[in-house]
Every structure is written in C-alpha cells, then in structure tokens.
C-alpha cells in the first residue's frame, strides 16, 4: 500500500512541474547537442595531440 501512495504522490508532484514549451525545449536540445559535439571534437584533438607527443618522446 505504501508503494501506491508513493506513486500517487509522484503523480501529484509531476503535475506541479513547469515543463519547457516547444521552442524552449528545441533551444535547450540544440544547446546540449552543440556542447557535446564541441567537447567530443576538443577531446579527440587533445587525445591525438597527446598521443603524437608521447610517440615523439618514446621514439
């Protein structure tokens, strides 16, 4: 019975949440994807640079 009360309470709280509208959600999604792509490229270049540096030191 406690689990049923828990889920009812969760439902009540979820109705109180202020969910983003369509344009706002799209803007947030684009921001997140752009940030992820930036960091993927950044760390790939950093990894390549460090690998090349280590290769030069070892040789």
UniProtKB/Swiss-Prot annotation:
Chief localisation class: membrane
Gene Ontology cellular-component terms listed: plasma membrane
GO biological process, alphabetically ordered: intracellular protein transmembrane transport; protein secretion; protein targeting; protein transport by the Sec complex
Compartments in which it is found: Cell membrane
Record has Protein transport as a keyword: yes
Transmembrane segments: 30-50
One Pfam family this sequence matches: SecE
Keywords carried by this UniProt record: Cell membrane, Membrane, Protein transport, Translocation, Transmembrane, Transmembrane helix, Transport
Single GO molecular function: protein transmembrane transporter activity
Keyword Transmembrane helix listed: yes
Membrane topology qualifier: Single-pass membrane protein
Function per UniProt: Essential subunit of the Sec protein translocation channel SecYEG. Clamps together the 2 halves of SecY. May contact the channel plug during translocation.
Similarity comment: Belongs to the SecE/SEC61-gamma family.
Quaternary structure and partners: Component of the Sec protein translocase complex. Heterotrimer consisting of SecY, SecE and SecG subunits. The heterotrimers can form oligomers, although 1 heterotrimer is thought to be able to translocate proteins. Interacts with the ribosome. Interacts with SecDF, and other proteins may be involved. Interacts with SecA.
Protein name according to UniProt: Protein translocase subunit SecE
Organism: Bacillus subtilis (strain 168)
Taxonomic placement: Bacteria, Bacillati, Bacillota, Bacilli, Bacillales
């Amino acid at each position: 019975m406690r689990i049923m009360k828990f889920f009812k309470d969760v439902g009540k709280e979820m109705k109180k949440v202020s969910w983003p509208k369509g344009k706002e959600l799209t803007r947030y999604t684009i921001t997140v994807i752009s940030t992820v792509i930036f960091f993927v490229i950044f760390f790939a270049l950093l990894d390549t640079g460090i690998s090349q540096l280590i290769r030069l030191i070892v040789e």
